[in-house]
Amino acid sequence: AGALALALWGKVDVQVFLNGFHTPFQDTFWVSVTAMGGTVFCLCVLLAGSIFSYRYMVSGIVSILCTMALVALLKHAFDAPRPLTVLTQAGVWDSIVLVEGHPLRDTLSFPSGHTAAAFSLFTTLALFATRAWVKTLLFLAALAVAYSRIYLMQHFLSDVLAGSFLATVISIAVYLWARKARWIDFGRPLVSLRRYGRPENPE
């Protein structure tokens, strides 16, 4: 749907349209949500998860590091301008509603790093999760971070689509590798997953 919207209306018109839904509550809410896309936050979640499974932790950390390395390379390769620059040049910046106190950047827009980190984290967790409702919540959390980057005028829809795609592909690849890497099980976690009805080392 996002790719279709970009094809039909272009990233500037899509950005201006989505900017029309600002409210004071959402300003505060999306600033909080976007923090879940920070690399430090994601790594802390995975380190905390190691009390349940080292496999989760290693898979997630490898996924995030690989994803963010590729994102950094692409950011500097494309050096794409952010909404601040593009919308100013398009003559529509004066009509844009901004979140007060949230600083804006003007370069290295493509792809979105926060979106990539969030999708890397939540995709990894979803792949290991066994319950459908948990997978759904994790997917919605990743989508929320992606939307927050657009809401806060940090990225275009194309940026978050690229970040989410790269992270998802890398996370799936790392997950498939981690399921077969026996050396990852280098110790017993603090909390046994058997208490929660599933094996600690899935095959």
Regions from the PLM with identified roles:
Residues V45-L73:
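Interfacial segments of alpha-helical transmembrane regions
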Residues A3-A7, V45-F52, L125-F128, Y147-Y151:
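Hydrophobic alpha-helical transmembrane segments
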Residues Q15, S50, V71-D79, A126, ...:
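Membrane-water interface at transmembrane helix exits
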Residues F25-Q26, S53-M57, T130-T136:
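Membrane-helix interface segments
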Residues A3-A5, W9, C66-L73, A141-M153:
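Aromatic-anchored segments of alpha-helical transmembrane domains
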